[in-house]
Amino acid sequence: MGVVEEAHNVKVIGSGEATIVLGHGFGTDQSVWKHLVPHLVDDYRVVLYDNMGAGTTNPDYFDFDRYSNLEGYSFDLIAILEDLKIESCIFVGHSVSAMIGVLASLNRPDLFSKIVMISASPRYVNDVDYQGGFEQEDLNQLFEAIRSNYKAWCLGFAPLAVGGDMDSIAVQEFSRTLFNMRPDIALSVGQTIFQSDMRQILPFVTVPCHILQSVKDLAVPVVVSEYLHANLGCESVVEVIPSDGHLPQLSSPDSVIPVILRHIRNDIAM
């Protein structure tokens, strides 16, 4: 195993001609895909990895400058694909990884046959004629809460993000992976994600995008998915799923996994 693969805990499982690469969002790691993977391994080669900064990665490898914007993560993704000699893949990106996949596809469109985006947003802060879901003051308070008492913030944020109470297995799972992050890294990653603005790159995307969205999501209003659909330069399709929360593949697998599989298996009908 190479340095890049080891640093990102890369796992390759399953068998099939087509390759699926699964990218996780903030506060999670590759375990967030545990309900989806069993449905893929018989038909696809499946690549799992952890974004740098996840609690499962070595915090000494986290370069605060490199990961102060999403481009650093997109270069990591390209490096993983190149190391594995993947010529083309279906990329399934949750939350920030959806936008990381989009960024990577701008540099290397040949590596991606389609991008399946789950709970994706190009910008989280409201703007003129744009509803991102947060005011800047909301985010300032969020960052201060992370800074002042990370564990307390995790316990409060997890049920809101997942859509459930602390008795929920999905909330407990997200709390675990969120709390695994080193607090200073979590703050840095959170600031990078929530302050990002990817709207300007959307018209230049050429790889087809399948946009999947919970009907109720604390972090991403449904109008954001419609914005992506309207502004992406590529072929795109939106499906709003009757699920609650920002991590539907973890919290509502019975209703969400079949939808993800359908978008993996079927291309956009023109």
From Swiss-Prot:
Name the keywords, alphabetized.
Cytoplasm, Hydrolase, Nucleus
Q: Report, as the record phrases it, the tissue specificity of this protein.
A: In young seedlings, expressed in hypocotyls and roots. In adult plants, expressed in rosette leaves, stigma, sepals and silique peduncles and tips.
| Family per similarity comment | Belongs to the AB hydrolase superfamily.
**Pfam families (UniProt xref):** Abhydrolase_6
Q: This protein's superkingdom?
A: Eukaryota
This one is known as: Probable esterase KAI2
Induction pattern: By red light.
Task: Write out the annotated subcellular location.
Answer: Nucleus; Cytoplasm, Cytosol
Consequences of knocking out this gene: Increased seed dormancy. Long hypocotyl phenotype under red, far-red, and blue light.
What Gene Ontology biological process does one annotation of this record name? Answer: de-etiolation
The UniProt entry annotates the active site at S95, D217, H246
Function of the molecule:
Involved in seed germination and seedling development. Essential for plant responses to karrikins, a class of butenolide compounds, structurally similar to strigolactones, released from burning vegetation that stimulate seed germination and enhance seedling photomorphogenesis. KAI2 is not required for strigolactone-mediated responses, but MAX2 is necessary for responses to karrikins and strigolactones. Lacks detectable hydrolase activity against karrikin. Karrikin binding induces a conformational change.
Q: GO CC annotation: what is one?
A: nucleus
What Gene Ontology molecular function terms does this protein carry?
A: hydrolase activity
